């Protein structure tokens, strides 16, 4: 796994990639992020085309440019169910949100709301796989591994009308 750091307006981030694609985008210290021990086995990549492309796309996103991420992803660290949830998140357009229940119904698992929530919380590719676009049933901000203040900031950046 190759890594780079990115200083974002919402705090330092870690970007990680395998030969197959981007496998991680985390805010430093976020819940469910990689441990320091695990990261010690990774290789810092001063020059890596995929990581550099991810960096540029994220900087454009943070600058408020209309954006759709175009990056190969490696989501193989998740279970089949988690991967299905993460793929469903990719279909939620910028500026829109869904509830955990909406996402469970979309996956034809209407009784699996808690399992969907757990998978959303374990998303390893923050922002690009837009788990921040998932809200509680009443439209309230709930759970975000990077902190609710970041979730609010990301939704505001995307022009979510409810904020």
List where the protein language model places each region.
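Basic nucleic-acid-binding alpha-helical/helix-turn surface characteristic of O6-alkylguanine DNA
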Residues: 1-111, 157, 161-163
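Regulatory, non-catalytic segments
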Residues: 114-123
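Short cysteine clusters
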Residues: 131
């Amino acid at each position: 796994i190759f890594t780079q750091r990115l200083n974002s307006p919402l705090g330092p981030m870690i970007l990680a990639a395998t030969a197959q694609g981007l496998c991680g985008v985390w805010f430093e210290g976020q819940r469910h992020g990689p441990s320091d021990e695990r990261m010690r086995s990774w290789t810092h990549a001063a020059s890596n085309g995929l990581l550099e492309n991810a960096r540029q796309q994220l900087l454009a996103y943070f600058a408020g440019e209309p954006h759709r991420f175009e990056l190969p992803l490696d989501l193989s660290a998740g279970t089949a169910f988690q991967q299905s949830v993460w793929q469903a998140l990719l279909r939620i357009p910028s500026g829109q949100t869904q509830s955990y229940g909406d996402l469970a119904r979309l996956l034809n698992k209407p009784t699996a709301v808690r399992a969907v929530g757990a998978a959303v919380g374990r998303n390893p590719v923050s922002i690009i796989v837009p788990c921040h676009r998932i809200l509680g049933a009443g439209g309230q901000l709930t759970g975000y591994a990077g902190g609710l203040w970041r979730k609010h900031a990301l939704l505001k950046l995307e022009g979510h009308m409810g904020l």
